[in-house]
Design a protein with these regions (language model features):
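Active-site alpha-helical elements of protease catalytic centers
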Residues: 185-188, 192, 221-265, 274, ...
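C-terminal subdomain of the subtilisin-like protease fold in secreted/lumenal serine endopeptidases
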Residues: 31-44, 78, 117, 290-297, ...
């Protein structure tokens, strides 16, 4: 979500250098409207839970002190991110949150549980040494990710035989953009998702193995062979194909078919994207010099994270710091707006959170409750369109909340096993935008993330309000240049490369 377009108070956090004071980025008193319904997370002793621990300043000294506070409080340090002053911890002590604040009273700003159930991915052994890795490039109940619809398999034969079925590429003028460029090998897109099939003929030549990683081991980056492969979901492979399926005589062609892809696995085998996984993903993308990330998910277990709830506010703080640090390091991020058919400017109910619990807690929410990462300032928030250009019935919407729109209904792309399938969701819209950003970065490598976002919005095709699909959901409001369905308009790949 572009900061300039947001009409309400949100997280505001810029992390550009070590030693920066990080106070007051999320205020529990700033939410507007009725207080949100508390969702207590009070595990008994002996239940291993995961936590974010945020320091007041982002520097190695405070991070070391926070780590000591964690261990003194009976916790285990899973992963530290001194660049942003965030420590990921696990503990089986019921009083861990209160105790770590006492032990780190001059350092710890906030502490929050990252999930409502016991940790499956318990971590043993020391974390890797601090500091960025070097890029390899020179210069259960399988919860549907983001609520997307199931995949419909599609057969493929012959040379790029399915390209003629890619109406989505025509809508965003990617086919015309390819006459200018297919993208640069110097551009790397991080696919924060469920993993990418490295054997798919349309993807294997574009996957950067050296920069791929698994973040689902408690939020600790793991480059073990095969760790970033898909296991229980085809979601990430489908998203990857939309971004950068190669022009190679097989199947389809992506928006940016010559850029590289890194699989950054943030979805576990049960289909959950916990906050520590996403923080790991954004930090990894920045450390490895990625140019673009795609984020076709919302962070579990809450569809909306409320700043008047201490646990949720601490998590939002950690995620915002990671997103902003990645942006400061040159990464621009696109995210799915969500599939609940909601107007994000007026939503007051959340019926399905926490979604990792046996029984969710229906709750009142307010405008201090946000879908993350889509509603983190600086992230490009993408709505979904049908083949005829209408807003998809499932797509979230909202004036000042949607930045751009892109095709997301019945999108043809790659799935594991060398196959192809149709999927629907804002998850399918976001990678079109990530691909356009990759083309734009290829054609204009000098542009910063903020400049890329500005050009993306300026280049979008203004689109007047339409009737809601099937007459469902809130009606469109605004002008052709900025409205609640299309944001600044339909993303335009051709203008991106000009």
């Amino acid at each position: 979500m572009s900061k300039s377009a947001r009409p309400i108070r949100t997280i505001a956090c810029t992390v550009a250098a070590l030693g920066l004071v990080l106070a007051g980025t999320v205020s529990a008193t700033a939410a507007t409207g009725e207080p949100s319904t508390p969702v207590p997370i009070n595990p008994p002793d002996g239940t291993v839970m995961s936590y974010v621990v945020n320091t007041g300043q982002a520097n190695p000294g405070q991070t070391r002190k926070a780590e000591k506070a964690v261990t003194d409080a009976g916790g285990v340090v899973v992963q530290s991110w001194p660049e942003i002053g965030v420590v990921i911890a696990q503990s089986d002590r019921a009083a861990f949150r209160d105790t770590v604040k006492v032990k780190g009273k001059n350092v710890v700003q906030s502490v929050g549980a990252t999930r409502s159930v016991e940790v499956k991915d318990k971590v043993t052994g020391p974390q890797a040494p601090w500091g960025p890795g070097s890029s390899g490039w020179n210069k259960g109940k399988n919860k549907p990710v983001n609520g997307d619809e199931p995949t419909e398999p599609v057969p493929a034969t012959g040379s790029d035989s399915l390209e003629g079925q890619q109406w989505d590429m025509t809508m965003i003028q990617a086919d015309q953009a390819h006459q200018v460029t297919d993208g640069s090998r110097n551009v790397l897109v991080g696919v924060l998702d469920s993993g990418i099939d490295p054997t798919h003929p349309d993807l294997q030549s574009n996957i950067d193995v050296a920069d791929s990683v698994n973040c689902t081991a408690g939020g600790r980056p793991d480059q073990a062979a095969g760790g970033w492969y898909p296991t229980t979901s085809d979601h990430g492979t489908h998203v990857a194909g939309t971004i950068a399926a190669a022009r190679n005589g097989a199947g389809i062609v992506g928006v940016a078919p010559n850029v590289r892809l890194a699989s950054v696995k943030v979805v576990n085998d049960d289909g959950f994207i916990y906050p520590e996984y996403a923080v790991c993903g954004f930090m990894w993308a920045a450390q490895r010099g990625m140019d673009v990330t795609n984020n076709s998910y919302y962070i579990d277990p809450f569809e909306f994270w409320c700043d008047d709830q201490p646990d949720q506010a601490a998590v939002r703080e950690a995620v915002a710091r990671a997103v902003n640090w990645s942006s400061a390091k040159g990464v621009v991020s696109a995210a799915a707006a969500g599939n609940s058919g909601l107007d994000l400017t007026v939503n007051t109910r959340d019926e399905g959170s926490p979604d990792d619990a046996a029984t969710p807690t229906p709750r009142t929410i307010n405008q201090g409750c946000k879908d993350i990462p889509a509603q983190v300032p600086g992230v490009v928030t993408v709505a979904s369109l049908t083949k005829d250009g209408q807003l998809s019935y499932f797509s979230n919407r909202g004036l000042g909340e949607i930045d751009v729109a892109a095709p997301g209904s019945r999108i043809l792309s790659t799935i594991p096993g060398g196959k192809y399938g149709l999927k629907s969701g804002t998850s399918m819209a976001s990678p079109h935008v990530a691909g356009v950003l990759a083309l734009m970065k290829s054609a204009h490598p000098e542009l910063s993330p903020a400049q890329l976002v500005q050009k993306l919005e300026d280049d979008a095709t203004p689109t007047a309000c339409s009737a809601p699909q099937y007459d469902e959901g809130a009606a469109c409001v605004g002008t052709p240049e900025l409205n609640s369905y299309y944001g600044h308009g339909i993303v335009n790949a051709l203008k991106a490369v000009q």
